[in-house]
Amino acid sequence: MAYYNTLALLTIFIFSGAFHRAQGTHGEADSKCPLMVKVLDAVRGIPAAKLPVKVFKQNEDKSWDLISSGTTSSDGEIHNLATEEQFVEGIYKLEFATKRFWSKLGLTPFHEYVDVVFTANDAGHRHYTTAVLLTPYSFSTTAVVSDVKEAHV
């Protein structure tokens, strides 16, 4: 039980830090970044660096088109996953290659991939920061959705 309480507290702490950092980042240097991710390795308590991430947009026939891909930086982040023009109203999927990530660390994970599927920009253009907390056998995710800056109008 103590393990789960510790994990819950760690999750709250990390996600609250991701939230505050995302708020400042989007309002400053990355004001034109409509989609970014922040991934944390809960086993080691550090950012999940070198994690491959793909962004897909759902078509009308429910198939998926790859929009972009990237790898998290040393701080566990990827900025500019989509341009303002690409990131229109629709359903999107972020695919995190978790098995590849954990295998490189010598661990055998449960999940091949972690997919985060969400609807974007259905209430007007917004900026999205998705935070993901990973372990080899679990994940948790949250999002910060911020309003458009005047520069985007």
UniProtKB/Swiss-Prot annotation:
Residues 1-24 form the signal peptide. Belongs to the transthyretin family. It comes from the Eukaryota. GO terms for biological process: purine nucleobase metabolic process; thyroid hormone transport. Detected in plasma (at protein level). Expressed during metamorphosis in tadpole liver but not in tadpole brain, nor adult liver. Homotetramer. Dimer of dimers. In the homotetramer, subunits assemble around a central channel that can accommodate two ligand molecules. Interacts with RBP4. Sulfonation of the reactive cysteine Cys-33 enhances the stability of the native conformation of TTR, avoiding misassembly of the protein leading to amyloid formation. One of its GO terms (molecular function) is thyroid hormone binding. Keywords: Hormone, Secreted, Signal, Sulfation, Thyroid hormone, Transport. This is Transthyretin. GO terms for cellular component: extracellular region; extracellular space. Thyroid hormone-binding protein, with a much higher binding affinity for triiodothyronine (T3) than for thyroxine (T4). Probably transports triiodothyronine from the bloodstream to the brain. It is found in: Secreted. L-thyroxine binds at residues 38, 77, 140. InterPro entries: Thyroxine_BS, Transthyretin/HIU_hydrolase, Transthyretin/HIU_hydrolase_d, Transthyretin/HIU_hydrolase_sf, Transthyretin_CS. Disulfide bonds: none annotated. The N-terminus strongly influences thyroid hormone-binding properties. A number of compounds can compete with and disrupt triiodothyronine (T3)-binding. Binds the synthetic estrogen diethylstilbestrol (DES) with the same affinity as T3. SUPFAM superfamilies: Transthyretin (synonym: prealbumin). It comes from Aquarana catesbeiana (American bullfrog). The modification Sulfocysteine is found at residue 33.
